Amino acid sequence: MSVPGPYQAATGPSSAPSAPPSYEETVAVNSYYPTPPAPMPGPTTGLVTGPDGKGMNPPSYYTQPAPIPNNNPITVQTVYVQHPITFLDRPIQMCCPSCNKMIVSQLSYNAGALTWLSCGSLCLLGCIAGCCFIPFCVDALQDVDHYCPNCRALLGTYKRL
């Protein structure tokens, strides 16, 4: 019997497989495909048992969305805030607002309300022979002016009364 055309009849055992490939052969052939990632667990809202066996609600966590990029330039303005300075009866170290240098203030004592009140009180007690002027010699009874030693600007005043 002759076979028509260029084909010839196969001789010997049949080349077609008689059974499908085994599972191991199939997995080995398809091993170059990546496996899909495991699904991530979502936020839990149920009760979770704590270490003491009691149920407790876990806190919910939410992520903030990523900021949208903006091509506009951002301008930054620096603001310097100078706190109010409390003047006392002793020199203070500060930056002079007039000459902008770090200084230690110079003190000047002037008669204030407490000085005059002390003088009047001593007059009422009978210290008329010049003793009533003693408060004008005591620095602890007078107001204090703070001056800059560089530019002689008045920085502030401490009033005793």
UniProtKB/Swiss-Prot annotation:
Domain LITAF positions: 76-160
Region of interest: Membrane-binding amphipathic helix: 111-134
Effect after changing residue 115 to N: In CMT1C; does not abolish interaction with NEDD4 and TSG101
SMART domains tied to this protein: LITAF
Motif residue range(s): PPxY motif: 20-23
UniProt topology in membrane: Peripheral membrane protein
Residue ranges annotated as motif PSAP motif: 17-20
Effect of residue 23 to H: In one EMPD primary tumor; somatic mutation
Tissues where the protein occurs: Ubiquitously and abundantly expressed. Expressed predominantly in the placenta, peripheral blood leukocytes, lymph nodes and spleen.
GO cellular component: cytoplasmic side of early endosome membrane; cytoplasmic side of late endosome membrane; cytoplasmic side of lysosomal membrane; cytoplasmic side of plasma membrane; Golgi apparatus; Golgi membrane; intracellular membrane-bounded organelle; lysosomal membrane
Result, substituting residue 112 to S: In CMT1C; does not abolish interaction with NEDD4 and TSG101
Induction conditions: Up-regulated by bacterial lipopolysaccharide (LPS) (at protein level). By bacterial lipopolysaccharide (LPS) and by p53/TP53. In monocytes by the Bacillus Calmette-Guerin (BCG).
Compartments reported by the entry: Cytoplasm; Nucleus; Lysosome membrane; Early endosome membrane
Sorted UniProt keywords: Cell membrane, Charcot-Marie-Tooth disease, Cytoplasm, Disease variant, DNA-binding, Endosome, Golgi apparatus, Lysosome, Membrane, Metal-binding, Neurodegeneration, Neuropathy, Nucleus, Phosphoprotein, Transcription, Transcription regulation, Zinc
Region (Disordered), start-end ranges: 1-22
Record family assignment: Belongs to the CDIP1/LITAF family.
Function (record text): Plays a role in endosomal protein trafficking and in targeting proteins for lysosomal degradation. Plays a role in targeting endocytosed EGFR and ERGG3 for lysosomal degradation, and thereby helps down-regulate downstream signaling cascades. Helps recruit the ESCRT complex components TSG101, HGS and STAM to cytoplasmic membranes. Probably plays a role in regulating protein degradation via its interaction with NEDD4. May also contribute to the regulation of gene expression in the nucleus.
Domain notes for this protein: The PPxY motif mediates interaction with WWOX and NEDD4.
Name of the featured protein: Lipopolysaccharide-induced tumor necrosis factor-alpha factor
